[in-house]
């Protein structure tokens, strides 16, 4: 990460470094930095109408290509909307990477009623994934 990059931009640069060529998602207020990173990358973005669609498209991409499917979703309901696809990919051992934004670090786990807040996205996804972490 350079001094001028946000975490979202650095995440996209890292995906590109590892050969990711396609991501699925919906731009939203919480994922703007991912999309700022996409603008300067060679990664193709497939816009979807619903996060569940992003998850199933990433799953299908992985099954067809043999490469991990990647989706970008917003915090809270964006992540939970993708949960069915995430669980399906996990149960079938399909490689999928889901990048979800979170609210501000100081708000995590506080129950302050922030936009799209979930107490712990990491805990919500733990039963559906092989690895779930919050990086804030």
Predicted regions located by residue number:
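N-terminal alpha/beta PP-like core and its mobile active-site loop of ThDP/TPP-dependent enzymes
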Residues: 1-136
């Amino acid at each position: 990460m350079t001094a001028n990059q946000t975490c979202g931009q650095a995440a996209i640069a890292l995906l590109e470094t590892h050969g990711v060529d396609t991501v699925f998602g919906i731009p939203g207020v919480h994922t703007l930095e991912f999309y700022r990173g996409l603008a300067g990358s060679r990664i193709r973005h497939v816009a979807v109408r619903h996060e569940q669609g992003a998850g199933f498209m990433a799953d299908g991409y992985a099954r067809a290509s043999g490469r991990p499917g990647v989706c970008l979703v917003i915090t809270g309901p964006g992540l939970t909307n993708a949960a069915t696809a995430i669980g399906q990919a996990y149960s079938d051992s399909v490689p999928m990477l889901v990048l979800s934004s979170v609210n501000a670090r100081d708000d995590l786990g506080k129950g302050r009623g922030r936009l799209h807040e979930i107490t712990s996205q990491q805990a919500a996804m733990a039963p559906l994934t092989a690895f779930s972490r919050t990086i804030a």
